[in-house]
């Protein structure tokens, strides 16, 4: 019973050691999630800054668009004024041309007939004073009209000059406004380019943050799934442990009952047959003297199938004699470690969920019940199995047991437990493909190919 407890403790250590990497991976995942959360927070800050930049640039763009609209309105107004001025200038030019012709004609007439002569002729040739006054008045009127025409001519020429200056000034203003508009258009284009870059940076930041967040969620989901699977395996292990303990208790009770029956039968036989073999007398007397020895040959023959259910159990009879230990050879001519030792059904002596449990269940399905090997970690089957008569060494072949401490076979270096598995196939390149329990993502029935170097191949006796 002590050996069973020790075996359970050791196997629990193996299971917990196998589960430890899952806890480590989950912890690493949580650490990575915390780091990525910080990255996402930083990305959100960058998003706010980018949005502020977008708002600022958009404000500038709106201002430029307003200026552009105002400038276009001013240009349209200047063009309209220029058209009106051009029309007025054309009219003034026509009026000036007509007056110029009239003044030129009057000037030529004045050269031929001077004003003084006109006045003298008017006085001399007048018939009366009234006629004189009328002619002089007419001459004065003509002179006044010519004077007004000259003044109007000068005025209109001055207006023409002023309007020309105005048109020229407006034209210059139009050119200046056009240049300003072009400059503003270039600035607008530049600002829009900056706005586009800022927007793209913002989108890239958001996309990156979302990708990282999704990666984190996927990684976290995978870690949680692994943790759930580990919890399920632990629960299955505990259930198997409970079943194994119940089966072991039943097996121990049956063994004790069988030993008691065998002891009673041996006592009855001894009382009815006084004469026994010398070897039996010697064995019995040695057992009585030491109170701690191997079972006698007759008792061994009677109870070998019962006592083999647990090589580590100890049973004390009422007289204080002790039947104990693991028989690995011949005692009184009976081979306890020979063929058939694993043929009698027993409860699974190996802790559930591990590599030894997987191999035991593999052979139990074939009606072969491997006895408890102590110490019985996976790598120890290679030496302790044959030494205790439970296993024997064979060559590499499909369906045999593989046991080793090699790093490639175990899966990591310096293992204190080693590993045991079932050979699925033997490959030409010096490797073997194995099926195993307590290993890999599949955990139960996991398959992989490893080097056959340093591996011992076994079969149950």
From Swiss-Prot:
The UniProt record lists the keyword Signal: yes
Leader peptide range in chain numbering: 1-27
Entry GO MF terms: protein serine/threonine kinase activity
Gly residues biased stretches: 330-340
Alphabetized Pfam families for the sequence: CC_PcsB, CHAP
Biased composition (Low complexity): 264-329
Domain Peptidase C51 stretches: 330-459
A cellular-component GO term for this protein: cytoskeleton
Region (Disordered), start-end ranges: 264-343
Alphabetical UniProt keywords: Signal
InterPro entries: CHAP_dom, Papain-like_cys_pep_sf, Rho-assoc_Ser/Thr_Kinase
Keyword set includes Membrane: no
GO biological process, one term: actomyosin structure organization
PANTHER family according to UniProt: MYOSIN-16-LIKE (PTHR22988:SF75), MYOTONIC DYSTROPHY S/T KINASE-RELATED (PTHR22988)
Full protein name: Secreted 45 kDa protein
Organism: Lactococcus lactis subsp. cremoris (strain MG1363)
Lineage: Bacteria, Bacillati, Bacillota, Bacilli, Lactobacillales
């Amino acid at each position: 019973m002590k050996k069973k407890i020790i075996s359970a403790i050791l196997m629990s250590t193996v299971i917990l050691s196998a589960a430890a990497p899952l806890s480590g991976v989950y912890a690493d995942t949580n650490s990575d999630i915390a780091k990525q959360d910080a990255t996402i927070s930083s990305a959100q800050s960058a998003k706010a800054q980018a949005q502020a930049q977008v708002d600022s640039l958009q404000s500038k763009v709106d201002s430029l668009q307003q200026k552009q609209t105002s400038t276009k309105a001013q240009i349209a107004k200047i063009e309209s004024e220029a058209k009106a001025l051009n029309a007025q200038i054309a009219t003034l030019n026509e009026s000036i041309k007509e007056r110029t012709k009239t003044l030129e004609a009057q000037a030529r007439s004045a050269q031929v007939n001077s004003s003084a002569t006109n006045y003298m002729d008017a006085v001399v040739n007048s018939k009366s004073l009234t006629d004189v006054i009328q002619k002089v008045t007419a001459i004065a009127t003509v002179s006044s009209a010519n004077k007004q025409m000259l003044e109007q001519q000068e005025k209109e020429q001055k207006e023409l000059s002023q309007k020309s200056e105005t048109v020229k000034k407006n034209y210059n203003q139009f050119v200046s406004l056009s240049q300003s508009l072009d400059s503003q258009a270039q600035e607008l284009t530049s600002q829009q380019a900056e706005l586009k870059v800022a927007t793209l940076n913002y989108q890239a930041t958001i996309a990156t943050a979302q990708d990282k967040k999704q990666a984190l969620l996927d990684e976290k989901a995978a870690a949680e799934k692994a943790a759930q699977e580990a919890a399920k395996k632990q629960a299955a292990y505990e259930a198997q442990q409970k079943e194994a303990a119940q089966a072991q208790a039943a097996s121990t009770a049956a063994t004790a009952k069988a030993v008691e029956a065998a002891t009673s039968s041996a006592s009855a036989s001894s009382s009815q047959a006084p004469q026994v073999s010398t070897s039996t007398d010697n064995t019995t007397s040695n057992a009585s003297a030491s109170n701690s020895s191997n079972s006698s040959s007759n008792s061994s023959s009677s109870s070998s199938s019962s006592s083999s259910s647990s090589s580590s159990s100890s049973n004390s009879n009422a007289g204080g004699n002790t039947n104990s230990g693991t028989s690995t050879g011949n005692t009184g001519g009976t081979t306890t470690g020979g063929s058939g030792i694993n043929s009698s059904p027993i409860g699974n002596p190996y802790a559930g969920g591990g590599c030894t449990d997987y191999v035991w269940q593999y052979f139990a399905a074939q009606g072969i019940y491997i006895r408890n090997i102590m110490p019985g970690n996976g790598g120890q089957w290679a030496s302790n199995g044959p030494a205790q008569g439970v296993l024997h060494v064979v060559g590499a072949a499909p369906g045999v047991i593989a046991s080793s401490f090699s790093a490639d076979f175990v899966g990591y270096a310096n293992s204190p437990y080693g590993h045991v598995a079932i050979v699925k196939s033997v490959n030409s390149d010096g490797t073997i493909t194995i099926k195993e329990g307590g290993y890999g993502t599949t955990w139960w029935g996991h398959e992989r190919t490893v080097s056959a170097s340093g591996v011992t191949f076994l079969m149950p006796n």
